[in-house]
Regions:
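Acidic, serine/threonine- and proline-rich intrinsically disordered appendage/tail regions
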Residues: 630-632, 646
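Extended, helix-rich scaffolding/adaptor regions
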Residues: 36-61, 101-126, 135, 139-141, ...
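Extracellular polysaccharide-recognition and catalytic grooves
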Residues: 112-132, 146-403
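Extended polysaccharide-engagement surfaces of secreted carbohydrate-active enzymes
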Residues: 270-277, 295-628, 637-642
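Short coil/turn linking the two alpha-helices of tandem helical-hairpin repeats
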Residues: 74, 78, 137, 191, ...
């Protein structure tokens, strides 16, 4: 695989180009998958399946994921005799696909190992195989076709169960987004079955409840022939349409409704109009939530910290769905970036994987690529818009009180601040083509990004680790500069009596100001280490070029981002890191603020400009009891920012 030979293109790709990239991604992955196939006579002589279990993925789901990928690849190239750089014969791929489909059917409620049965992932454990059998049906024998029908119908029947209702911490939304598409396929593929109408109705019910709010339960609005309140039996999302999972705002689950593309596709391919249920809150969510999260390289921001794999671009399927089904042309610009970055990374890894995660977890990606390919094949794309236009549409301040996050999208940056009970990362991300076609580095979504380590030395015993912050109090989260900037202030406290004050002021231009101070409930010595620390990183396929320029109070990394501190910086910092001040021990009295510090972060700024700005950033006044005033300069001119300390 040649990563150097693949060049990233800034333009928005058309559907034909997207299909080609999706097929390349799938074919590369299939080369890896072929090393995981195992022979077994567990259910019939000459059977087989893939070793495809992994993090969050059951063995059956992993095999189903591979089935749809194989079927799409084989049907897209009906005349090809060999596949992948390994020149795998077509007959081998067809054989493994057929045997895997049969193994999944025979092992449903099986008495041998491995087996699978109705459970919370049951839809995912067979939807890919069911679709694969449909696409590849003319190459399958009657017995296999009959087995697939029997298993599909049995799984569809198992979905007549209680719809989950979980708004806080562990949403029930994802279950709904998985189950509705399966029922859509069963109802349309087997429309001659006496149960098809019931599956169709149940599909709509699961779909409506995927993005259900409290107000939906009272709504008389008519959708799919009934008042909405008659469909809704749950409350799975917050009033602002944000979604929690894993105890935080895990945005992979925010876009889990990307699976609705599979459901809509089932209706379209069998000549029926998709139900309105798949559109429930979809446009409002894009406009008010999810478009705030997609970055210039097509990746999605994790405001409360990374969940699952970093920079896998797995959420590109949501962009495909928004682009084609919801007609959001801007999503196409982000999709174009995401799938190119995924292919570049895959080529660099060289195995077909996207790195970091295990094989079973990785199988979720070719599943998404396969369905995205099918959508681009069967649904016309809206007229494309450029990335510049798409990004401009998303500019502004987004405040999400239920998940405790504020996001500011400005022309050269995205600033994200979290005051979540567990995680309070601060991200200041440079945006623009330099973060796509020629990125010098990325800032990982570490949950401690922009944080600090502080320990008490009062006991005479050195603490090995700082205690976790246990109480967060939001003081302010508001729009400034006529909606073009934002300010967030909060305090966070610990059980040992230490409180940190944090204030972030994101200006409409390239400048963002961070201010902090500390308070202790007891007299004593307190050690503050690495305040406002950031670390740069990169992914496979993108060599990290970090060139550090610095002075006493300023530092610039690769003419990409500049920092100016009110304190003297550490004498030695690795070229990929920043901290706003040297480690220092303070003698503090109970109730008094200490360690006050401010930093101005400039995005997309040459180092000569950062050096010049350093002379113009200064504290005007510091009253440890009341207020800190900071004077700075940016491309918009001079500004004075005041930080009021809590009483």
């Amino acid at each position: 695989m040649d990563a150097k030979g693949f060049k990233l293109r800034p333009k928005t790709l058309d559907s034909k180009e997207c299909r080609r990239i999706y097929l390349n991604l799938i074919e590369n992955f299939v080369g890896w998958a072929e090393t995981k196939f195992v022979e077994t006579d567990a259910y019939e002589k000459g059977g087989g399946h893939f070793r495809a279990s992994g993090s969050g993925v059951t063995w059956a789901r992993g095999n189903s994921n591979l089935c749809i990928a194989y079927a799409v690849l084989l049907t897209a190239y009906p005349e090809r005799k060999e596949f992948t750089i390994h020149k795998i014969p077509r007959a081998q791929l067809e054989n493994h696909l057929r045997r895997t489909i049969r193994f999944l059917c025979l092992s449903y409620r099986g008495k041998r190992k491995p087996s699978w049965r109705p459970g919370w992932q049951v839809s995912l454990e067979f939807l890919g195989a069911a679709w694969a059998a449909h696409l590849f049906e003319k190459h399958l024998d009657k017995d296999t076709v009959d087995l697939v029908r029997k298993t599909t119908c049995a799984v569809a029947d198992s979905l007549k169960k209680r719809i989950p209702s979980r708004r806080f911490g562990d949403t029930g939304s994802e279950d709904c987004t998985w189950n509705a598409p399966f029922l859509a396929f069963a109802a349309n593929k087997y429309a001659d079955d006496s149960r098809a109408k019931k599956w169709d109705e149940l599909c709509k019910k699961w779909a409506f409840n995927a993005l259900s709010t409290g107000n939906d339960k009272k709504s008389d609005s008519v959708a799919d022939g009934r008042p909405l309140k008659e469909w809704i039996v749950s409350e799975n999302v917050h009033p602002d349409l944000t979604i929690e999972n894993h105890g935080m705002w895990s945005v992979g689950y925010q876009v889990a409704c990307q699976a609705f593309a599979h459901g809509e596709l089932a209706y379209r391919l069998f000549g029926r109009k998709p139900p309105e249920a798949f559109a429930h809150h979809a446009d409002d969510m894009w406009r008010n939530v999810t478009r705030a999260l997609y970055l210039w390289d097509g990746d999605i921001l994790f405001p409360t910290g990374q969940d699952w794999s970093w920079k896998s671009y797995a959420q590109s399927e949501y962009l495909c769905w928004q682009r084609l089904s919801r007609r959001q042309a801007a999503a196409g610009a982000f999709e174009s970036r995401a799938i190119q970055m995924a292919l570049k990374r895959q080529l660099a890894v060289g195995t077909g994987a996207l790195g970091y995660s295990n094989f079973g977890n990785n199988t979720t990606k070719p599943n998404k690529w396969a369905f995205s390919y099918l959508c681009h094949k069967h649904i016309d794309s809206p007229d494309p818009v450029s990335m510049e236009e798409a990004y401009k549409e998303s500019l502004g301040v987004y405040i999400f009180p239920h998940v405790k996050v504020a996001v500011h999208r400005a022309p050269t940056k995205i600033v994200s601040v979290s005051w979540h009970d567990k995680y309070q990362p601060i991200y200041i991300l440079p945006e623009g083509d330099s973060t796509f076609a020629n990125p010098p580095f990325f800032f990982p979504y570490a949950r401690t990004s922009g944080g600090v380590r502080i320990t008490s030395e009062s006991t005479g015993k050195k603490q090995r680790r700082a205690e976790r912050w246990s109480k967060i109090q939001l003081l302010e989260a508001e729009r400034t500069h006529e909606g073009k900037g934002t300010r967030v202030r909060y305090t966070r406290s610990r059980k040992d009596g230490i409180t940190q004050y944090v204030s972030i002021a994101s200006l409409p231009d390239e400048a963002t100001v961070y201010c902090t101070a500390f308070q202790a409930s007891k007299d004593g010595a307190y050690r503050v280490e690495s305040p406002f620390h950031f670390k740069a990183a990169t992914i496979q396929g993108f060599p990290m070029r970090t060139e550090q320029h610095r002075g006493k109070r300023w530092l610039n990394i690769s003419d990409h981002v500049g920092f100016v501190s009110t304190a003297v910086l550490p004498a030695k910092l690795p070229s990929d890191r920043f901290a706003a001040a040297d480690d220092r021990t303070y003698q503090a009295k109970a109730g008094e603020w200490f360690g006050a510090l401010a930093v101005v972060v400039y995005t997309r700024q040459p180092h000569a400009r950062t050096r010049k700005m350093a002379d113009r950033v200064r504290l005007l006044a510091e009253d440890a009891k009341k207020v800190i005033s900071l004077r700075l300069e940016s491309s918009s001119g001079g500004s004075t920012v005041q930080f009021k300390l809590p009483k």
